[in-house]
Amino acid sequence: MNNNIILQCINLTKSFYRKKEEIRTLNKISLKIRKGDITFITGKSGSGKSTLLHLLGGLDKPTSGSILFDGVSLHSMSSNEIAKLRNLKLGFIFQFHHLLLDFNVLENIAIPSLISKKSIQESKEKSYEILKKVHLEKKINKYPSELSGGERQRVAIARALVNQPSLVIADEPTSHLDKNNAKIIFDLIFELNSNLNTSFLIVSHDLRFIKKAPILLEMKNGQLFNNKN
C-alpha cells in the first residue's frame, strides 16, 4: 500500500432488507484519502453520504468490502482498537458543535487528549497550542454560551485536532452558520490543512465553497462519482 494513503475503502457495500428485498445504501464504493488531501463529498439527502462517514469512522460495519486505515483493516481490529483509532488518528466535526456547556473553551478542547491518558498539564498545553491555530486564544476561559456560532464551531475544530489526527471527517460543518461564519470555517480548514498537513474529508452542500475543493466527489444512489473537471 502506498505510504501516502491514510484511508482506503474497497468495494464498500452497505445493505438492509425490506420484505426480503435487498436495499443498497452504498454500492461498491472505492475511495482513497492521501496525506494532505482535502476531499469534498456532495450529494442529495438520502444518497448515502452519512452512511459512508459512519463506516469510515468505524461507527458501523459494512455488509461487504473493506476499509483500511494506514494499511490495517478495520475488520481485523477489536472494538477497543477501533475506539482508540477514533480518538488518536481520526478527528470528527459535526453539524452541531456538541461542546459541553459547563466546560470552558480550553476544557472542551482537552477532552480527547485526556481520554487518551495524557496528563492534565500536557492536555492543557496541547489544547492551548491548537487554540492559537484556530485564532481563539483570547477566548480560552469563555464558555460556549459566551461564544458566537462560528466561534463554537472553531472550538469544535480545535477539539478534533488536539490529538494531531491523520484525518478529520467533517459532516456539514457550516450548515448552521451564516455566510460570513461559513467562510471563516472553510478558510480555517484550508489554512489548517496547509499548516498541519492534516487530511480532511468533508461532506457539504455549500456550493459557494465546494467549488474550491481540490478533490470533489458526488454521491448518487449509493455510488461515488468524480465531479471535478
From Swiss-Prot:
Localization, UniProt: Cell inner membrane
Class of the enzyme per the UniProt entry, highest EC level: translocase
A GO cellular component entry from the record: plasma membrane
Family annotation (Gene3D superfamilies): P-loop containing nucleotide triphosphate hydrolases (3.40.50.300)
NCBIfam families to which the protein is assigned, alphabetical: LolD_lipo_ex (TIGR02211)
Protein name (record): Lipoprotein-releasing system ATP-binding protein LolD
Record-linked InterPro entries: AAA+_ATPase, ABC_transporter-like_ATP-bd, ABC_transporter-like_CS, ABC_transpr_LolD-like, LolD_lipo_ATP-bd, MacB-like_ATP-bd, P-loop_NTPase
Family, as annotated: Belongs to the ABC transporter superfamily. Lipoprotein translocase (TC 3.A.1.125) family.
Assigned EC number: 7.6.2.-
MF GO annotations: ATP binding; ATP hydrolysis activity; transmembrane transporter activity
SMART domains, per database record: AAA
